[in-house]
Structures are given as structure tokens and as C-alpha cells.
């Protein structure tokens, strides 16, 4: 009864929720029905609290719909339901691996194999290297916001249950948005939980270099043994595998071997897996076997929080109005924000002057001037029109069909987000519209970004295009 009832709920929730949300929060839940009490088991406290906060009403509604007057009471626990001892597993084919990678983490019976660095004694010196995980990048100094919330949540779950929760985890987004920080944070957390865990972080080019050295030294078997013995392999900028056929071939087999052993893989890229050119389709398909999450440019509040956090790290007092002044003008990525703040702090130290808005305007005058030239309302209109294959004149017209109205609302919201123009100025640039029309458009797009995966994806794509 419990399996069929919960299966009905799962099927309906899968239709109602965005695919990423369903995969991350709902699919890992297990169900058990006893004495008319349905217990949902979450893999950790974080997932339990999130599901209870976000989806409790939806689950109760479905139980009422499917059970009528005989609705079971609902409770949540951290853990897993009691299951019978598993039968010996048959030999698995690649198709079996593909099917299992999308199953709930708790149904995967094998545990990650933990090895120590001593296992690599036979690996030649050029190939054998330590973890490269940066101890400075941890979860507690990663600034969370709407733009990175899902990525951070997925990274935390992976670090709590490596090899079982979302394998592989694929993070994508523009430069300087925090993908590398999350990789290191996962690596640090895994080692904190298990000091014997073998975690390796590297840029994809290092993998290529290691393979070339192994071929030169006739040590390809040692290369394979080393990479397939890790508990977690964290590879940055996987797009640099493009057009490197021999490296892709070796990584393909390494990828399969790690997944077979329930060893964690986390990859990052500057674009969605299927959009990576020069990489074999079989690899791109595998990149999407687990969970794929976009890391978006930080919104204003997150940019301010990042500046305040970095100022605190430097033991510098940064007034709120100064942080907002910088954050409103530098929007593309975290690295740019940090660089600008470092310049402001250095100038303040050299001159002994207090950090005010006027001081920041002077210290960053060339950067601010360049930024204002980069994104204009005119540029936004042209980019949106091209993206939706309509004319700029359509955006300025009085037409109200959805094929025009929605892109117009998106363009207005982008103008508010990416420029310093007031609402009346934006309205005037869109065919002389009233500022209340612009405000309505901004609120509508903000709402749709929460409800519609397509609108969220379009908005992110346009932000990346305009900020690159």
C-alpha cells in the first residue's frame, strides 16, 4: 500500500514541480506506511526541513485526493525505511549503470570505497599528486543567495553522502560565480567527515597533462589505477576536454569505473552539458545522469552580502550605502566584485581616507565607466529581440500578444537589473510606457522565475549573454 500510494504522489509531484526541484528534494524520499501513518524518510536533516517547509501542503493535498476520508497521518524522519537484505547483485551492464544513476540514492546498495594515499605507491611521481583541495574554500564562507541556492544545497548533500546523492553532480554557469568554491567546499567537507577519504580536485587540463605524461612514461596503467582509486573526483571547467579525443576516451572509462564503484564525481562547466561543443555525445549524456544545476549571476542582495562578507574578512567597515553603490554597478560575477573591493581597500590604505561613495566613485572610475558602456537599454532590447526572434520595434509597440508581451516584460526586468536607469526612464525607452507598467513587468518576471523553469532559464541565458 505504501509503495503504490507514494508512487501516485511522486508521479503527480513530478508533473507539478520543475525537474531540478523534483530530483533534488522529492525523489530521494522513501516511504513506509504502518498503522495508517505514512512516514517519509529523508537522507539528512537539511532535506527533511526543506521538504516539510516547501512541499508539505502539496503532499497533504495529494493524500487527501487519493485516500478520501481514510487519509493517513504524515510524519518525517531522517534515515531510510527498513528493507530486506539484498540479493547478490548480478553483473551490471552500462545500461544498468545508466538506469541506477537516476534512481534514489538510498536504493543504491554499494557504499563508496575509501582508500588511503598509500594505495598509490606505484604511481609515478609525475602523475601522483595530492588532493589540491583549497582549505580556505568551505561552506561556511560561501555566501548563499537565490542565484546559487540549489547548487549549494546539492553540494551539501553530496558532501554528506558522497557517491550516493546525485552522482555525477554537474554545476554550470559563467566565470566567477562560485562553482570552484563549491567544488573545494565539497572536498573539504568530505575529508572533514572521513579523514581517510581520497579526494582529488583538478582543472580538466591537469587530467589531460597527466594522461600525456603517463603515455610518455609508458605508465598508462598507473594513471588508470590512480584516477579510479579516488573516493571523489572534482574536475573544474570540463569544457576544456573539447576536441581532445584521447583524453575524452580515457575519461569516459574513468567516469564509468567511478560510477560503478559509487565514487563521487563533480564537474563544472561554463555551459549546459549538451551545449559543450567538441565533446562526444556519450560523455555529454553521462554528464546529465545525476543532477545538473545552474549557478546564476548573483542578484543585488547577494552581491551586497558578498561585499559585506569580504570586507569583514579584511576587518574593514563597509557602510551599507557604499556596498549597495558598488553592487548596483558591478553585476557580472563574484570575482569582479572582490577585485573591485580589493582595489577600494588598497586605495583607502594608501591614502588614509575613509571609504565613502565619493571615494569609491573615484577609486573605481575606470571600471564604472566601462561597466556603464557595456550594458545599455538599447543593447538589452536588441539582445532580447534576437533571442526571441522578434523585432526591436515589437518590444516598443503596443502589441499585447504573449509572443511579444513576455519578451517585453523580460527586457524591462533586465533593464532594471542591469542598468542604473529609473523606472520612468525605462518605461520611456519602451515606447513611452508608464513607470507602473515597468514595475508590474519586473514583479511578473520575478514571479515567473519562481514558477516557470523556461522563464528562469531564459532569464539566466540573457543575463549571461549581456554580462559576458
From Swiss-Prot:
The keyword DNA-binding applies. Residues 84-131 are annotated as: Domain II. GO terms for cellular component: cytoplasm; plasma membrane. Residues 1-84 are annotated as: Domain I, interacts with DnaA modulators. Residues 132-348 are annotated as: Domain III, AAA+ region. GO terms for biological process: DNA replication initiation; regulation of DNA replication. Residues 85-104 are annotated as: Disordered. It holds the Pfam family Bac_DnaA_C. Induction: Represses its own transcription. Residues 349-468 are annotated as: Domain IV, binds dsDNA. It is found in: Cytoplasm. Gene3D superfamilies: 1.10.1750.10, 1.10.8.60, 3.30.300.180, P-loop containing nucleotide triphosphate hydrolases. The keyword Kinase does not apply. GO terms for molecular function: ATP binding; ATP hydrolysis activity; DNA replication origin binding; lipid binding. Residues 85-95 have a biased composition (Low complexity). Its main location: cytoplasm. Keywords: ATP-binding, Cytoplasm, DNA replication, DNA-binding, Lipid-binding, Nucleotide-binding, Repressor, Transcription, Transcription regulation. ATP binds at residues 176, 178-180. CDD domains: AAA, Bac_DnaA_C. SMART domains: AAA, Bac_DnaA_C. HAMAP family: DnaA_bact. Domain I is involved in oligomerization and binding regulators, domain II is flexibile and of varying length in different bacteria, domain III forms the AAA+ region, while domain IV binds dsDNA. Oligomerizes as a right-handed, spiral filament on DNA at oriC. Plays an essential role in the initiation and regulation of chromosomal replication. ATP-DnaA binds to the origin of replication (oriC) to initiate formation of the DNA replication initiation complex once per cell cycle. Binds the DnaA box (a 9 base pair repeat at the origin) and separates the double-stranded (ds)DNA. Forms a right-handed helical filament on oriC DNA; dsDNA binds to the exterior of the filament while single-stranded (ss)DNA is stabiized in the filament's interior. Complements a temperature-sensitive E.coli mutant, the DnaA consensus is 5'-TT(A/T)TNCACA-3'. Belongs to the DnaA family. This is Chromosomal replication initiator protein DnaA. The gene is dnaA.
Amino acid at each position: 500500500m505504501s509503495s503504490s500510494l507514494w508512487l501516485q504522489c511522486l508521479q503527480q509531484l513530478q508533473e507539478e514541480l520543475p525537474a531540478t526541484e523534483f530530483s533534488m528534494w522529492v525523489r530521494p524520499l522513501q516511504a513506509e506506511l504502518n498503522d495508517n501513518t505514512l512516514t517519509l524518510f529523508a537522507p539528512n536533516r537539511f532535506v527533511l526541513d526543506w521538504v516539510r517547509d516547501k512541499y508539505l501542503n502539496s503532499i497533504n493535498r495529494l493524500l487527501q485526493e487519493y485516500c478520501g476520508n481514510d487519509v493517513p497521518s504524515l510524519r518525517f524522519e531522517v534515515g531510510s525505511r527498513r528493507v530486506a537484505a539484498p540479493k547478490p547483485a548480478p553483473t551490471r551492464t552500462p545500461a544498468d549503470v545508466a538506469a541506477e544513476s537516476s534512481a534514489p540514492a538510498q536504493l543504491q546498495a554499494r557504499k563508496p570505497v575509501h582508500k588511503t594515499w598509500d594505495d598509490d605507491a606505484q604511481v609515478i611521481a609525475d602523475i601522483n599528486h595530492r588532493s589540491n583541495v583549497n582549505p580556505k574554500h568551505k561552506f561556511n564562507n560561501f555566501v548563499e543567495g537565490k542565484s546559487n541556492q540549489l547548487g549549494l544545497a546539492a553540494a551539501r548533500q553530496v558532501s554528506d553522502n558522497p557517491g550516493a546523492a546525485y552522482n555525477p553532480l554537474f554545476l554550470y554557469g559563467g566565470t566567477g560565480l562560485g562553482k570552484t568554491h563549491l567544488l573545494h567546499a565539497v572536498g573539504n567537507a568530505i575529508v572533514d567527515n572521513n579523514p581517510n577519504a581520497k579526494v582529488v580536485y583538478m582543472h580538466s587540463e591537469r587530467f589531460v597533462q597527466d594522461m600525456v605524461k603517463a603515455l610518455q612514461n609508458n605508465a598508462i596503467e598507473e594513471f588508470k589505477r590512480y584516477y579510479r582509486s579516488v573516493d571523489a573526483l572534482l574536475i573544474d571547467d570540463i569544457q576544456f576536454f573539447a576536441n581532445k579525443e584521447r583524453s575524452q576516451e580515457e575519461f569516459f572509462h574513468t567516469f564509468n569505473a567511478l560510477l560503478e564503484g559509487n565514487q563521487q564525481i563533480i564537474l563544472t562547466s561554463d555551459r549546459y552539458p549538451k551545449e559543450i561543443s567538441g565533446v562526444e555525445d556519450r560523455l555529454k549524456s553521462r554528464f546529465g545522469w545525476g543532477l545538473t544545476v545552474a549557478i546564476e549571476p548573483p542578484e543585488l542582495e547577494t552581491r551586497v552580502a558578498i561585499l559585506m562578507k569580504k570586507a569583514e574578512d579584511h576587518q574593514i567597515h563597509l557602510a551599507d550605502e557604499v556596498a549597495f553603490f558598488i553592487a548596483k554597478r558591478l553585476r557580472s560575477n563574484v570575482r569582479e566584485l572582490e577585485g573591485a573591493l580589493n582595489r577600494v581597500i588598497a586605495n583607502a590604505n594608501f591614502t588614509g581616507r575613509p571609504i565613502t561613495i565619493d571615494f569609491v566613485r573615484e577609486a573605481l572610475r575606470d571600471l564604472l565607466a566601462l561597466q556603464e558602456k557595456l550594458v545599455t537599454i538599447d543593447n538589452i532590447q536588441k539582445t532580447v529581440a534576437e533571442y526571441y526572434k522578434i523585432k526591436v520595434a515589437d518590444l516598443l509597440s503596443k502589441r499585447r500578444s504573449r509572443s511579444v508581451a513576455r519578451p517585453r516584460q523580460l527586457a524591462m526586468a533586465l533593464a532594471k537589473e542591469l542598468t542604473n536607469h529609473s523606472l520612468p526612464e525605462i518605461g520611456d525607452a519602451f515606447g513611452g510606457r508608464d513607470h507602473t507598467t515597468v514595475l508590474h513587468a519586473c514583479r511578473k518576471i520575478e514571479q515567473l522565475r519562481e514558477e516557470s523553469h523556461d522563464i528562469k532559464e531564459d532569464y539566466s541565458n540573457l543575463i549571461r549573454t549581456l554580462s559576458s
